[in-house]
Amino acid sequence: MPGDSPVVSKRAAPKPRRAAMPGDSPVVSKPPDGAGPGDKAGGLGKAAAQMAAAPAAGKKLPRLPKCARCRNHGYSSPLKGHKRFCMWRDCQCKKCSLIAERQRVMAAQVALRRQQAQEEELGISHPVPLPSAPEPVVKKSSSSSSCLLQDSSSPAHSTSTVAAAAASAPPEGRMLIQDIPSIPSRGHLESTSDLVVDSTYYSSFYQPSLYPYYNNLYNYSQYQMAVATESSSSETGGTFVGSAMKNSLRSLPATYMSSQSGKQWQMKGMENRHAMSSQYRMCSYYPPTSYLGQGVGSPTCVTQILASEDTPSYSESKARVFSPPSSQDSGLGCLSSSESTKGDLECEPHQEPGAFAVSPVLEGE
């Protein structure tokens, strides 16, 4: 009512406290029943603190990160959605510089962990580190070919990457591919760009054979090798041919003197024929010549034709038949069917491709 006087709230007078005795337990005082507007704000803060402390004991609340730059300058700002509007995002003070450095380090660590995880998925567990100091690298393959990479003395270029790929090399002789980066900011530039590759490296792509007449694709030569005679041969022609062939075959390697079964090729008597399989009849890149070289596999059949009318003595036939050529190899001479001797050139295929027999034909008996 307008006539009523305003009601003044009365506060309860506090009771006098007695002095605490040593044996008494601490007593928690209760808040007063009535509270003013100032006390109401304090009561709300205490209630909020009690409500926050109650679930903290049972369940941990999610973490609410705050802006570190604002904290350095005395402000507490939640980090969510605050980065674009932070007043100290471009601050260059000492504390904010430490924050920026820590962020760069953490970003580098995250990128490194991601790269390691990708390498483990791909199966690359331990990457090969590059050598610190450039040194000559020599890698030898099983085909006795080497690749020598040497550093030149003139620092002409600054950056270069060298990748040597041996695609045509055998799988046993693999070559290590190394990338050699160079840093432009070095004081003393090490010239890793000018690399000299040894000429022996290219020998792995095409290796010439050890013997000059060993050039066919399947390692079959185009010339035919003279063969040794059997020591137990009783014919006069076989013995004569064997002695001359033994003298001329001293320089031949022992590998081509024996067949797969380990027996020597033999020139036998009248009953044996010269046998040759069809797989050895290959065309040659060179025209047929009148002398014999190393290896077997020529499509021509070698027979020695000794006619009694044309050979008055063995010395003349020896000088005429086994006349060494003048230019290339100390091979044996060969009599072809176009010469003036009388005889038959007989070639019959046999079942055994590894056995070759040359039969002399004696006429006039």
Curated annotation (Swiss-Prot):
Transcription factor that plays a key role in male sex determination. Acts both as a transcription repressor and repressor. PANTHER family: DOUBLESEX AND MAB-3 RELATED TRANSCRIPTION FACTOR DMRT, DOUBLESEX- AND MAB-3-RELATED TRANSCRIPTION FACTOR 1. It comes from Gallus gallus. Residues 1-47, 120-170, 316-365 are annotated as: Disordered. It is found in: Nucleus. Pfam families: DM (PF00751), Dmrt1 (PF12374). Keywords: Activator, Developmental protein, Differentiation, DNA-binding, Metal-binding, Nucleus, Repressor, Sexual differentiation, Transcription, Transcription regulation, Zinc. Knockdown of DMRT1 in early embryos results in the feminization of male gonads, affecting tissue organization, gene expression and germ cell distribution. These experiments are in support of the Z dosage hypothesis for avian sex determination or at least, for gonadal sex development: according to this theory ZZ males would have a higher dosage of DMRT1 which would initiate testicular differentiation and expression of the key conserved Sertoli cell differentiation factor, SOX9. Belongs to the DMRT family. Residues 35-45 have a biased composition (Gly residues). It comes from the Eukaryota. GO terms for cellular component: nucleus. GO terms for molecular function: DNA-binding transcription factor activity, RNA polymerase II-specific; metal ion binding; RNA polymerase II cis-regulatory region sequence-specific DNA binding. PROSITE patterns: DM_1, DM_2. GO terms for biological process: cell differentiation; male sex determination; regulation of transcription by RNA polymerase II; seminiferous tubule development; sex differentiation. Residues 341-351 have a biased composition (Basic and acidic residues). Residues 63-109 bind DNA. Expressed in the genital ridge and Wolffian duct prior to sexual differentiation and is expressed at higher levels in ZZ than in ZW embryos. This is Doublesex- and mab-3-related transcription factor 1. Transmembrane segments: none annotated. InterPro entries: DM_DNA-bd, DM_DNA-bd_sf, DMRT, DMRT1-like. Residues 324-340 have a biased composition (Polar residues).
